[in-house]
């Protein structure tokens, strides 16, 4: 039987590990061998080849494959970032959204939305940006989510 102190110590350790895992989004990469396909997930701090990193306003780090640069929704996010923070030569790219909103957008992008949904999402992002600007100085960032 495990004593109480050891059990509490183990629980605290697992909670810390779980908290670290929640902060990272890692993309699955398929590697094909001659007989089977295996999927591995990378959660290290180094960025894999063919990926780029962006940060959110709440300092959460996201790594994306370069193929996301061809997506019109992601292009709009980068334009908004450029308008908000400018182009940084040596610093990281920071998106003017929190991590919850970015995770929401990632789900839409991964689902390969149709043209109408993409247009609605772009309009939602643009309107949220326009409605945020006067309020930013007073109350911080507020965001509206488009629900389908």
Curated annotation (Swiss-Prot):
Its main location: membrane. It comes from the Eukaryota. It holds the Pfam family Auxin_inducible. One of its GO terms (cellular component) is plasma membrane. It is found in: Cell membrane. The keyword Cell membrane applies. Keywords: Auxin signaling pathway, Cell membrane, Developmental protein, Growth regulation, Membrane. The keyword Manganese does not apply. It is a peripheral membrane protein. GO terms for biological process: auxin-activated signaling pathway. Belongs to the ARG7 family. PANTHER family: AUXIN-RESPONSIVE FAMILY PROTEIN, AUXIN-RESPONSIVE PROTEIN SAUR65. May promote auxin-stimulated organ elongation, such as hypocotyls, stamen filaments and petals. This is Auxin-responsive protein SAUR65.
């Amino acid at each position: 039987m495990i004593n109480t102190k050891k059990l509490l110590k183990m629980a605290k350790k697992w909670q810390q590990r779980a908290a670290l895992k929640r902060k990272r989004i890692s993309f699955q990469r398929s590697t094909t061998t001659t007989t089977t396909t295996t999927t591995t997930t990378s959660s290290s701090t180094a960025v894999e080849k063919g990926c780029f990193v962006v940060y959110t306003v709440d300092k959460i780090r996201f790594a994306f494959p370069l193929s996301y640069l061809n997506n019109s929704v992601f292009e709009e996010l980068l334009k908004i970032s450029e308008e908000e923070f400018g182009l940084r030569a040596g610093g990281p790219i920071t998106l003017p959204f929190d991590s919850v909103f970015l995770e929401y957008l990632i789900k839409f992008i991964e689902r390969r939305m149709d043209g109408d949904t993409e247009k609605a999402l772009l309009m939602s992002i643009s309107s949220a940006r326009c409605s945020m600007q006067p309020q930013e100085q007073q109350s911080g960032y507020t965001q509206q989510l488009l629900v389908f």
